[in-house]
Amino acid sequence: MQKINELQLAKELIRFPSVTKTDAGVIKFLEKKLKKIGFKTKILEFKDKNSYPVKNLYARLGTASPNFCYAGHLDVVPPGNLNDWTVNPFKPAVKKGYLIGRGANDMKSSIAAFVTAVGNFSKKNKKFGGSISLLITGDEEGIAINGTKKVVEYLRKRKEKIDFCLVGEPTNPNKLGEMIKIGRRGSMTGKLSVIGIQGHVAYPNRANNPSTALVQILKKLKEVKFDKGTKDFQPTNLEITKINIDNSADNVIPGLASASFNIRFNNKHTSYKLKNKINKVIKQICNKNKSKYKIEYSVSGEAFLTKPNKTTFMIQNTIKKITKIKPKLSTTGGTSDARFIRKIAPCLEFGLVGKTMHKVGECVSLSDLKRLTLIYTKILDNYFKWKLA
């Protein structure tokens, strides 16, 4: 079995400029690495007429249960202005105890840590009696149509059972060991267009200004108290993200006014119920103003919570022993691919410190990378000892 080093593998992965939509060969590269340490692999490429094709990878070591899965993504966000970087973002460099490069934090180093952990674990436990799998996508930072969502559908159709999934996203705000994600809020975007009647500002009786209704709707939506939050979740929150009145003249009442809003909601709601509540507000105000309207919704994911159990506490205690910090169980932050995986398996998220993700100069502490590898190794060790005892 080939020996793997987490720093070396992280560097190799970062060298691939796998900005979302561009695989650049990184999935195939990881597949070869996994094959060398005994994994059976399958590259899954999905296409959709409304989006770009995406390569994904599912790999499994062993055939027995339980199946411990690690999920992550190899696509990265664009590096931005290259002149703002001290190094080429796709030629990783180590400086002052940090590995610098695009994806060093989110999340190629986490993948490198887990693959190294599997190598360390399987070397000492050649017949551990279960399975370890990896679900790796090339589209988490993008629209995520042909990524983890379709891999989950594929696994479900094949009746591939995953007993537990650890998602390796950077979950810690400032220090390694601070936070485990046990759920995520739901996310829904609304695009609202209010249709009026264009006219001269001096003759408002001959027109119907759609901005009047739009402003009233947005004000009302911001005033809605959806809930007070729960023990595990923050209160549901709606933010207005765009307002547009396409009108270049000061003496013209516009015929169209539009706005977008995003709502992050907890598990007291579903997107369906929120749509009904919001639609009621829109309809009432538009009727009052004699305006027509059009509303379109897109749902990134529903809110979910993995209730803390023995696996949660085992992972929490394992992290505490290595970092000397007891991780908080949290549902804060944005969406992740856990929203898809939770449909087939209980899942938690734990990875690196996310302070530099998506930033110029993205980096990871070499100490954190080493400790994350140790944490992942110990989690595997404790999981299979407990499950197969």
Residues covered by each model-derived region:
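N-terminal helical capping/dimerization or prosegment-like subdomains
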Residues: 1-80, 256-260, 274-277, 366-368
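A structural signal for isolated positions on well-ordered beta-strands in alpha/beta enzyme cores
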Residues: 42, 69, 133-135, 294
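Active-site metal-coordination/substrate-binding segment of hydrolases
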Residues: 67-133, 158, 368-371
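Acidic-glycine-rich active-site phosphate/pyrophosphate-binding loop
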Residues: 79-94, 166, 183-193, 317-318
